Amino acid sequence: MKLIKGGVTAPQGFSAAGLHAGVKAGSSPEKYDLAMILSDRAASAAAVYTRNRVKAAPIYVTMDHLGSGTARGVIVNSGNANACAPDGHEHAEAMCIAAAK
């Protein structure tokens, strides 16, 4: 793997940030648990998905949102991997709506 100077923000028009958002209840405030990569405009986007029969709700939301082949942002969370959580679809959509603001 080759590291690119500037990382994910090396290409012009991209920015990124990470923070502690408390995605997982009780997590340490020092632990970053949410990151976002943002493009100034719609950019070509693609994803590789699991072949498992059981997929977390965010996978289905991502599949739907990437149907056009473009995106302006990517949200990454850490510390919350329960694929069978109740209301997962609603929570994933709410995260997308919050990020869009």
Segments (PLM) and residue ranges:
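Histidine (H) residue identity feature
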Residues: 20, 65, 89-91
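Broad gene-expression machinery/nucleic-acid interaction feature
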Residues: 31-33, 56, 73
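N-terminal amphipathic/basic leader segments beginning at the initiator methionine
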Residues: 1-50
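Short glycine/serine/threonine-biased micro-segments
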Residues: 16, 71, 77
